[in-house]
């Protein structure tokens, strides 16, 4: 993903942002950092066709509209990958979102892939080959929350170096086992991780 456009979502009335491989958000409390990150979780739930459940468990439709549904009547988003894109528009239905538009595009050409359902069509759509790239990306979106680094942090929990090595848990419970697996199986990748950290924290030497 190299560009994202969001309209009407939470604290974002109209946002257009070019993305790099690594993006750092800096701002005061309430400036929208958490809302921006939450949009990627929103995207993943949308792709997995679990948007209705996700919205219901996170405060209902009104919580997702910019300044509420009395001010905003639609959430629109476009995510771009070089010369291809995926876009959608959500409006309020009967206590749930309705897709008023869902499209795949290539340069200036676009194809409607679904409308007026409560869940996205992108996961099951197979009409365009460009959809496969976008599906793969959306399916792999994960939110990791590593805010708590105190004594009771998930980082301090024990993890099994065999059973907990396959993917990183959302709160970092298995960070040690996950990094150990990378160190043992793909040392080049492990060293790259260390060097990236050192690029912003030169005093860091290693994880052990």
Predicted regions and their residues:
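N-terminal pre-Walker A segment at the start of P-loop NTPase domains
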Residues: 1-13
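Phosphate-binding P-loop
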Residues: 14-20
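Hydrophobic anchor at the beta1->P-loop junction of P-loop NTPases
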Residues: 25
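The conserved Walker
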Residues: 29
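Conserved P-loop NTP-binding catalytic core
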Residues: 38-95
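Electropositive, glycine-dotted interaction segments
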Residues: 82-208
């Amino acid at each position: 993903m190299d560009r994202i456009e969001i309209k009407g979502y939470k604290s974002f009335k109209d946002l257009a942002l070019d993305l790099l491989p690594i993006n750092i958000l800096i701002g005061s409390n309430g400036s929208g950092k958490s809302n921006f990150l939450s949009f990627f979780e929103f995207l993943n739930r949308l792709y997995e066709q679990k948007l209705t459940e996700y919205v219901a468990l996170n405060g209902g439709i009104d919580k997702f509209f910019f300044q509420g549904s009395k001010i905003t009547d639609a959430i629109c988003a476009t995510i771009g990958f070089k010369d291809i894109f995926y876009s959608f528009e959500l409006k309020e239905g009967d206590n749930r979102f309705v897709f008023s538009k869902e499209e795949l595009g290539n340069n200036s050409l676009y194809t409607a892939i679904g409308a007026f359902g409560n869940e996205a069509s992108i996961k099951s759509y197979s009409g365009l080959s460009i959809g496969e790239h976008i599906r793969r990306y959306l399916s792999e979106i994960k939110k990791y929350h590593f805010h708590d680094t105190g004594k009771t942090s998930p980082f301090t929990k024990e993890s099994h170096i065999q059973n907990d090595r396959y993917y990183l848990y959302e709160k970092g419970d298995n960070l040690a086992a996950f990094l150990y697996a990378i160190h043992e199986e793909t040392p080049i990748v492990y060293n790259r991780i260390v060097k990236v950290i050192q690029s912003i924290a030169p005093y860091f030497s290693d994880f052990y």
